[in-house]
Amino acid sequence: MEARPVHRSGSRDLTRTSSIPSTQKPSPVEDSFMRSDNNSQLMSRPLGQTYHLLSSSNGGAVGHICSSSSSGFATNLHYSTMVSHEKQQHYTGSSSNNAVQTPSNNDSAWCHDSLPGGFLDFHETNPAIQNNCQIEDGGIAAAFDDIQKRSDWHEWADHLITDDDPLMSTNWNDLLLETNSNSDSKDQKTLQIPQPQIVQQQPSPSVELRPVSTTSSNSNNGTGKARMRWTPELHEAFVEAVNSLGGSERATPKGVLKIMKVEGLTIYHVKSHLQKYRTARYRPEPSETGSPERKLTPLEHITSLDLKGGIGITEALRLQMEVQKQLHEQLEIQRNLQLRIEEQGKYLQMMFEKQNSGLTKGTASTSDSAAKSEQEDKKTADSKEVPEEETRKCEELESPQPKRPKIDN
């Protein structure tokens, strides 16, 4: 049976065990106490007899209470059960009647003067108590040794059971332990003890089943996917197979596995390694505050450096070519603009020259025409005057002129 702790106000624990059967024969004192119906004898009897009251097997008592006399009550009161259920019911009636009428005043009933002289060594003089308290494992004997070291009588008196105590008001059947003589039932109880602990840790049954299913699946997967160490030679073969298939993006685990043809290598190994190879190849640069890089093997480190260096060089060359191309285009555009500007300047200069030459020619032609017209007019006038004179001279010659008289001065 499971032990039930009963907590009192004095922080004393009450435990019950079913593994210690009582085989002690009842003493004459215990028989006399069990047969008596006088309730006042509970306080008038010595404490040793009261102790045997609880430890007697003749009346079917709960068992013996392992307590001390010189140092007060023990902190742990152990109850051992009996086999017969009828004896338990018989003692329950007698003990409940006797326990109800205990005095409520602890100070007056349990003073230092009223204690009997043989109370201090009752566990040594009474052989029944010694036989009941000595157990095979020696646990209770050690408790007696610890109890003898204490001498606080007031604390011992405060922990006596009175009628005002809530423990007395409860039913004694709760304090009695029901045991069965069948060994199969005991085995079942011992097997069922750790079940409450499992329920406390994992309340739901579905949660309890999950670890079992996961472990079975993990074991199955472990048999199919065993861990494998990738050596540099295996990695080189893997890289060659990936390159032969057209790169890491086009390569498939099945194709790589066929090309490698390594004994013990499965598709799961190739798949995981291919995924790691892809992530290592296209891994972004770590930030300043980011996590440190994963340690790579020398071969992977070299390949990653080569890839990074090649990518950097090609990117730089591509950018340089683009810049040079843009510069050439800009120079060509500037050259064309300069040529057009020069042509336009030449054309304008020619237009200005033509305009100037046309103005000069126009003025010269007008002046020449005027001079020519004047000369022609003069010539025509001269030509007209000359014939008139000639004709007059001719007429004068032809006609006779009269003789003029000479005048004498």
From Swiss-Prot:
The record's listing under InterPro entries reads: Homeodomain-like_sf (IPR009057), Myb_CC_LHEQLE (IPR025756), Myb_dom (IPR017930), Myb_dom_plants (IPR006447), PHR1-like (IPR046955), SANT/Myb (IPR001005)
Sorted alphabetically, the Gene Ontology BP terms of this entry are: cellular response to high light intensity; cellular response to phosphate starvation; circadian rhythm; regulation of DNA-templated transcription; regulation of monoatomic ion transmembrane transport; response to arsenite ion; sulfate ion homeostasis
Where are stretches of biased composition, namely Low complexity?
Answer: 192-224
Briefly explain the null phenotype: Strongly reduced shoot growth, and slightly increased root growth. Reduced expression of phosphate starvation-induced (PSI) genes, decreased cellular inorganic phosphate (Pi) content and shoot-to-root ratio, and impaired anthocyanin accumulation.
> Pfam families under this entry?
Myb_CC_LHEQLE, Myb_DNA-binding
- Mark out the compositionally biased spans (Basic and acidic residues): 1-15, 371-396
A molecular function GO annotation: DNA binding
Post-translational modification summary for this protein: Sumoylated by SIZ1. Sumoylation controls phosphate deficiency responses.
Query: How far does the signal peptide extend, from start to end residue?
Result: none
- Which keywords does the record carry? Coiled coil, DNA-binding, Nucleus, Phosphoprotein, Transcription, Transcription regulation, Ubl conjugation
What domain of life?
Answer: Eukaryota
**Residues in HTH myb-type domain copies:** 222-282
Cellular compartments annotated: Nucleus
* Phosphoserine modification, residue list: S399
Q: Report quaternary structure and partners.
A: Homodimers and heterodimers. Interacts with SPX1 in a Pi-dependent manner. Does not interact with PHL2 or PHL3.
What does the record give as the function of this protein?
Transcription factor involved in phosphate starvation signaling. Binds as a dimer to P1BS, an imperfect palindromic sequence 5'-GNATATNC-3', to promote the expression of inorganic phosphate (Pi) starvation-responsive genes. SPX1 is a competitive inhibitor of this DNA-binding. PHR1 binding to its targets is low Pi-dependent. Regulates the expression of miR399. Regulates the expression of IPS1 (At3g09922), a non-coding RNA that mimics the target of miR399 to block the cleavage of PHO2 under Pi-deficient conditions.
NCBIfam families from the UniProt entry: myb_SHAQKYF (TIGR01557)
The similarity annotation says: Belongs to the MYB-CC family.
Q: What is this protein called?
A: Protein PHOSPHATE STARVATION RESPONSE 1
Q: Which organism is it from?
A: Arabidopsis thaliana
Q: Lineage of the source organism?
A: Eukaryota, Viridiplantae, Streptophyta, Embryophyta, Tracheophyta
